[in-house]
From Swiss-Prot:
HAMAP family: PQQ_syn_PqqB (MF_00653). Belongs to the PqqB family. This is Coenzyme PQQ synthesis protein B. PANTHER family: COENZYME PQQ SYNTHESIS PROTEIN B, HYDROLASE C777.06C-RELATED-RELATED. GO terms for biological process: pyrroloquinoline quinone biosynthetic process. Gene3D superfamilies: Ribonuclease Z/Hydroxyacylglutathione hydrolase-like (3.60.15.10). Keywords: PQQ biosynthesis, Transport. It comes from Pseudomonas aeruginosa (strain UCBPP-PA14). The lineage of its organism: Bacteria, Pseudomonadati, Pseudomonadota, Gammaproteobacteria, Pseudomonadales. Pathway: Cofactor biosynthesis; pyrroloquinoline quinone biosynthesis. May be involved in the transport of PQQ or its precursor to the periplasm. The gene is pqqB. Transmembrane segments: none annotated.
């Protein structure tokens, strides 16, 4: 299984266009040891030729340009993206579909809740129906059964409902429904390598922990270091848990969760611009290093 990190930042990217927190200011003027990142998205493949896009970042055009395998140029217009899987209906995970309209029709796999949000509140499905057949919805069931996607037939996917938050525009924002957010457990039938992918993760219970323990590689929510980070940095008024993101530090935080699982690789993704782990010289980054936890970066490649 090939895993390509196309984008590793949370919504807004890093640096965020209107943000002057320590990290954003520092990456612009060189005073912070950090590298810019685009908004979160990954690509998966079973053969390195056909790819499944997991979430469609607003930065998808730049991400494709940075990864030539997605544009193999075999014909006048071409793409190696054979399918798209949406793990939620967040703006920063779906807006990229607009930039992919020239390649319609696209096979888009998502839950019924996500399809509802993208048909009504943020109506990408009806909007893009005017471009060569638009988006063809392929429903993801929440029955715990593995499913295959024809673009990469040697991969098996299992959708895992997560406790997180629907986007602000969704009628489910304050009324969570199963399927608003999912994680993916992905298995390669040839190598037996396994991935657990959950860029938006608000709570971890014992059932979810069991899925995480089965994975060779964890690619999980790295949004915030501390739950009150947005308030402390004076860039927001919500706690991480109110936004559906489990902070890394503190009792029950992601660091404690990851210490309970044996995965060979533990990687944080969807990292907010305020998070001190973006600074490679920070004490927080040193704590991750000491714990064997990696920080995803744009262009990172993992093979299982």
């Amino acid at each position: 299984m090939h895993i390509r990190i196309l984008g590793s930042a949370a919504g807004g990217g890093f640096p965020q266009w209107n943000c002057n927190c320590r990290n954003c200011r520092g990456v612009r003027d060189g005073s912070v040891a950090a590298q810019p990142r685009t908004q979160s998205s990954i690509a998966l493949s079973d053969d390195g030729e056909r790819w499944i896009l997991c979430n469609a970042s607003p930065d998808i055009r730049a991400q494709i340009a940075a990864f030539p395998a997605l544009q193999p140029a075999r014909r006048p217009r071409d793409t190696a993206i054979g399918a798209i899987v949406l793990l939620d209906s967040q703006i920063d995970h779906t807006t990229g579909l607009l930039s992919l309209r020239e390649g319609c029709p696209h096979e888009v796999w998502c839950t019924q809740m996500v399809h509802q949000d993208l048909s009504e509140g943020f109506p990408l499905f009806p909007m893009l129906s005017h471009w060569n057949g638009g988006l063809r919805h392929r429903p993801i069931a929440l029955d715990g059964e593995p499913f295959a996607i024809p673009a990469c037939p040697r991969l098996r996917f299992t959708a895992i409902p997560l406790r997180s938050s629907a986007p602000p525009y969704s009628p489910h924002r304050g009324d969570p429904h199963p399927g608003d957010n999912i994680g993916l457990f992905v298995e390669d039938l040839d190598s037996a390598g396994t991935l657990f992918y959950a860029p938006g993760l608000g709570e971890v219970d014992e059932a979810l922990l069991e899925w995480m323990r089965r994975a060779d590689c964890l690619l999980v929510d790295g949004t915030l270091w501390r739950d009150d980070e947005m308030l402390v940095c004076e860039v927001g008024d919500k706690l991480g848990r109110q936004m559906g993101h489990l902070a890394q530090s503190g009792p029950g935080g992601m660091l404690e969760v990851l210490a309970k699982v044996p995965a060979a690789r533990k990687v944080l993704i969807h990292i907010n611009n305020t998070n001190p782990i973006l600074d490679t010289a920070s004490a927080e980054r040193a704590e991750l290093d000491a714990s064997g936890i990696e920080v995803a970066w744009d262009g990172m490649h993992i093979q299982l």
